């Protein structure tokens, strides 16, 4: 058995694959790979002897694609599988076990979590940017606000205004700088600036590239497509006394089978959090509130509220499934089909979720045709119009709901009118007109009875119209309201998480270049100059990764704006539903009152 196969088997036996994957993702792999130098630098931070470190580097070079088997690790790159194998070798070496014998390595089933040295711990840093509210700066402005670096060990914070506590960003030694460059965190661990700087499109486009960019092929987005999933409230509640919760049965069709699963509100909330973590820059639908509160006091969850929340959850899950990207996610499909308990599954899926841009590179055609001025104007205008339109549609939903409630109240009054009209001259009260018994009493009594029946029919029509409005026109208005809201929140997330640390990295490159010049002038040791050169190289690679991510965000939002354009079809459907309902019930009312007219026109007057 080869060393790679033995190490892979040991990874499966120990169950440390997810730990090693987490470290792999921290280096922001490009096309599913990270430079092999990351492993060599990682070896310098673990507690093993120098001889073992050299041996580990040699073994890693032998299992890498492109490695020459004799320490050729600097010219190679790691895939996720080879990274797991190499990191397991280091883990085994740290435990003092034989790490170069496949026959012994394959039997390893228990390991101590990797222990990093103080230098390695010091290199664990977080990038953060202070952002509050909606920025008033352009979407692609030249400046970044309040860049800061926070050390997880010393709690030192260095701001870009030059004031610092603890270490200075310019006083760190090259080893700490290189470790900092290698500690790129995933998007879920970063709070980036709200205003990414403008990037030069030609910097990423080869001269030979040509053509017109088109969005990646996706399933067709049809905002008015019929719901593929239905929700119903389960009558029996679960949980302990005073902490009982409502369950929902989700019914969907998979092939020829109809699948029904049970979920609670917190499960839907988890699904939204998962989508926001993985698809931060896409239109993630909005959830209805879990409970209603007035002045900080929660209202009781009566049947009326539970029904409204059920409709809101139905809109949420169906809008997720309609989205050409979100709806194809494996976790979303599993959410609506997995019958088993999903507690463990949710934890596993959420912990392993990574931003959708991991391992992707921007299409050069998109960069080439990008018009920054046009995009800035378009996006800024969209933000303003989204706010205005959203507020108007919110008011529309309130008014439609109010009309439906008035119809229900009017139906109750119509029922009372029908009752009292029928009781005005009952058969037992004919004694009122017994003196002049000319036959008119009987005709009028029959007329009252028929009028009462017609008014009862009118009452039923009003109730049907109110219910139809709530599940028809009002639901369509709410779907459009939530489409506007999800797009508006997308731009909010862009401002909060769409920035980068390019200015900070460029400043650090300039500082290190100056140090290299000074070191050459004073004829410093070549090892010091090489460390500075490696730091500059790693910073340059990080800038390229940040630029690539910024372009991917722009491409993603451009695609989402294209999808959003189709939501105008929801307005058409809303108007059609409104018109059809009005014509339908106008004809029914006309037929009902026309029949009453025929019944009463021949009464004696």
UniProtKB/Swiss-Prot annotation:
Domain (PX): residue spans on this chain: 226-343
One Pfam family for this entry, by name? Snx8_BAR_dom
Location of the region described as Disordered in the Swiss-Prot/TrEMBL record: 113-147, 175-213
Annotated localization = Cytoplasm; Membrane
Membrane topology, record value: Peripheral membrane protein
On whether Zinc-finger is a keyword of this UniProt record, the answer is: no
Where, in this chain's numbering, is a 1,2-diacyl-sn-glycero-3-phospho-(1D-myo-inositol-3-phosphate) bound? 264, 266, 290, 309
- For bias kind Low complexity, which ranges apply? 180-193
Cellular compartments per GO CC:
cytosol; endosome; membrane
Q: What's the family?
A: Belongs to the sorting nexin family.
Query: This protein is called what?
Result: Sorting nexin MVP1
Origin species, per record, is Yarrowia lipolytica (strain CLIB 122 / E 150) (Yeast)
